[in-house]
Amino acid sequence: MRLVLLGAPGAGKGTQAVVISQKYNVPHISTGDIFRSNIKNGTELGRKAKEYIDKGLLVPDELTVDIVKDRISQPDCKAGFILDGFPRTIYQAERLDEILKELNVELDCALNIYVPDEEIIKRMSGRRVCSKCGMSYHIVYNQPKVENICDSCNGELIQRDDDKEETVIQRLNTYHKQTEPLIEYYEKKGKLLTVHGQEGVDDTTKEVLNALSGVKL
């Protein structure tokens, strides 16, 4: 299974990617995780990426394409992979096609998880993370026992810069302008599947697995 996950930030792509990864025994490749790791470790790539991420902008193509090419060329991707956060532009999608051609493989499908903007804003701006251990919470859906205090280590809960409402709105605007055209791109190639992700996680998972069961591998 070689799969691209599409959908606005906060649509639940990462959650569903874990399920799909376990079901099809292929690695989940999140460009967001790669960038966050580099930012945390203070690498040159991390410093460059942080400038864009903090403003709610996309990391430039040339920074992203090389990372993805290297990752999907690894032995554990021979049987497939799930790309989460890439491609985000038509140019990146075209570059991905070139990379796959070089590897003599094809993309099986692009799965689009659709969630309305209002729900995305509610989900993302309500996120909180522990400043000590990194555990995730939500002020509506997953509250700590004591407000703003981590259940596990008593660390202070903070809102990441890219989860602030004004940044979320900027990220959505960027998504609609630059990433949404990918839906049409993959639809024209006959690779697009769309599921609705505004219900609970379990309902979305059922819809995702049902949609993927019809993909010819």
Swiss-Prot record:
The keyword Kinase applies. ATP binds at residues 10-15, 127, 136-137, 199. GO terms for cellular component: cytoplasm. It comes from the Bacteria. Its EC number is 2.7.4.3. Pathway: Purine metabolism; AMP biosynthesis via salvage pathway; AMP from ADP: step 1/1. GO terms for molecular function: adenylate kinase activity; ATP binding; zinc ion binding. Keywords: ATP-binding, Cytoplasm, Kinase, Metal-binding, Nucleotide biosynthesis, Nucleotide-binding, Transferase, Zinc. SUPFAM superfamilies: P-loop containing nucleoside triphosphate hydrolases. Residues 126-163 are annotated as: LID. Residues 30-59 are annotated as: NMP. Consists of three domains, a large central CORE domain and two small peripheral domains, NMPbind and LID, which undergo movements during catalysis. The LID domain closes over the site of phosphoryl transfer upon ATP binding. Assembling and dissambling the active center during each catalytic cycle provides an effective means to prevent ATP hydrolysis. Some bacteria have evolved a zinc-coordinating structure that stabilizes the LID domain. Catalyzes the reversible transfer of the terminal phosphate group between ATP and AMP. Plays an important role in cellular energy homeostasis and in adenine nucleotide metabolism. Monomer. This is Adenylate kinase. It comes from Acetivibrio thermocellus (strain ATCC 27405 / DSM 1237 / JCM 9322 / NBRC 103400 / NCIMB 10682 / NRRL B-4536 / VPI 7372) (Clostridium thermocellum). The gene is adk.
